[in-house]
């Protein structure tokens, strides 16, 4: 599915097609436009064949066109929602140009629409240039997954195709970009040795220090199956 809401339940039941979501007042609408991602995170639900076949966020019929996404949106009044979030199974900025086109069209109709991006923070490496000027004025919040306080552990977790350079590029090129609001979100993974749903406090403190040095916000949330 392309447009969905989050129910608060665990697993696949936590995602609900917007057509089945009922009253959208005060809710976030999530936009899922691609399966593509430059990482292969060990904690990601998309890693198992079962999830890829059965999870409703997996775009089995290919990526929706800009026109198809806008047609879905045309059925709903976005004045009543809380926030629009580009998220999903893939990295939204793998379709940077298309995402921007969708936002531009929606903001022509809803100029006060709040828009957030959930990203792994690799767009500059994906495109080989600084893409942050294209985010300015379109997104109100850019939420970048941090996950770990050092590059080696981060690479072990994300298995990024860009290797070690990925971590530094995210911190010094992605996080420090001139966005109006820059919210760094640390999405924790489950520590299977400790059977815990969040990082140990000492690692969280290191992540807090990284964000403090960068002048950005850290939001810690537990891993969700």
Regions found by a protein language model. Name each.
Residues 38, 49, 147-149:
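Short connector loops/turns at beta-strand edges and beta->alpha or beta->beta junctions
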Residues 40, 53, 151-153:
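Short acidic/His/Gly/Ser-rich catalytic and metal-binding motifs that mark active-site loops
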Residues 22-26, 55-62, 66, 83, ...:
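Catalytic phosphate/metal-binding cores of nucleic-acid and nucleotide-processing enzymes, i.e., regions
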Residues 64-89:
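Short Fe-S-cluster ligation motifs
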Residues 1-35, 42-61, 78-80:
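N-terminal [4Fe-4S]-dependent radical SAM core
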Residues 15-17, 71-72, 128-132:
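A generic local structural motif
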Residues 89-225:
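Conserved AdoMet/S-adenosylmethionine-binding subsite of the radical SAM
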């Amino acid at each position: 599915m392309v447009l969905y809401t989050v129910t608060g339940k665990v697993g696949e039941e936590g995602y609900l097609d917007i057509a089945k979501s009922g009253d959208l007042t005060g809710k976030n609408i999530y936009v899922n436009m691609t399966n593509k991602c430059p990482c292969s995170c060990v904690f990601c639900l998309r890693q198992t064949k079962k999830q890829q076949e059965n999870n409703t966020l997996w775009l089995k019929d290919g990526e929706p066109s800009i026109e198809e996404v806008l047609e879905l949106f045309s059925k709903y009044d976005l004045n009543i929602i809380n926030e629009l979030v580009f998220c999903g199974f893939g990295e939204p900025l793998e379709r940077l140009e298309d995402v921007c086109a969708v936002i531009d069209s929606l903001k022509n109709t809803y100029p006060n629409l709040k828009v957030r991006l959930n990203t792994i923070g690799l767009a500059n490496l994906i495109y080989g240039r600084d893409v942050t000027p294209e985010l300015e004025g379109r997104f109100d919040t850019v939420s970048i997954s941090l996950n770990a306080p050092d590059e080696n552990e981060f690479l072990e977790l994300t298995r990024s195709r860009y290797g070690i350079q990925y971590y530094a590029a995210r911190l010094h090129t992605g996080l420090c970009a001139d966005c109006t609001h820059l919210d760094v979100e640390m999405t924790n993974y489950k520590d299977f040795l400790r059977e815990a749903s969040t990082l140990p406090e000492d690692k969280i403190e290191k992540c807090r220090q990284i964000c403090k040095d960068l002048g950005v916000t850290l939001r810690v949330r537990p891993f969700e199956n």
